[in-house]
């Protein structure tokens, strides 16, 4: 019964293959966990902005106009004035040539329509573009190299500490169970001694048996002894 208990205690010791397998699985699990947490933290911390694509489908996106509304109005007014001066020059040249239009108002209206949209329409269009360009959508930026290195360093430190703790734990458990091994050796020695004693006892009995056989050759009764035999 004692030998059976020793055998069970020895069987409970951890195999090196089992220890390495458990350590590798734990390290992989911790690495995946740290990597996923680092990616989520980077995505939450580094939030950027992105401009909406333009209505024409260009890849560059909608761009804001440079300058203020007053500058745009002044430039438009200057353009309109220049157009009017050009129209007046055309009318003056036609009048000089002798071909005068009897309805100059209608001619000017036709030229203004051909020239483009009015100033109010341009201002409204510019305001609409400003509203479109001011709309911004959050977008996760790619983490920088320094951030990636920092997260990799943190993951390596966590993995190293985990492996060291596992190794120390299993070594401590193995060290606690190692003093019980001499008791098993002593039991084996006792069994060997008992077997040796049994063999010696068997040899002794055999010797006694041989001695008895030698003693049986001598005459047991003196009456049967023949004097002439000696």
Swiss-Prot record:
Coiled coil: none annotated. Residues 184-210 have a biased composition (Gly residues). Residues 46-150, 175-230 are annotated as: Disordered. Changing residue 218 to G: In strain: MAS. GO terms for cellular component: membrane; symbiont-containing vacuole membrane; transport vesicle. Residues 51-77 have a biased composition (Polar residues). Keywords: Cytoplasmic vesicle, Glycoprotein, Membrane, Secreted, Transmembrane, Transmembrane helix. The chain crosses the membrane at residues 14-34, 151-171. Changing residue 94 to D: In strain: Beverley, Castells, FOU, MAS, Me49, NED, RUB and TONT. Residues 86-100 have a biased composition (Acidic residues). Belongs to the Gra6 family. Changing residue 219 to A: In strain: Castells, FOU, M7741, NED, RUB and TONT. The keyword Cell membrane does not apply. It comes from the Eukaryota. Changing residue 213 to G: In strain: Castells, FOU, M7741, NED, RUB and TONT. Major granular component involved in excreted-secreted antigen (ESA) immunity. May have a structural role in the membranous network of the parasitophorous vacuole (PV). Glycans are attached at residue 74. Residues 110-128, 214-230 have a biased composition (Basic and acidic residues). The keyword Lyase does not apply. This is Dense granule protein 6. Changing residue 185 to G: In strain: Beverley, MAS and Me49.
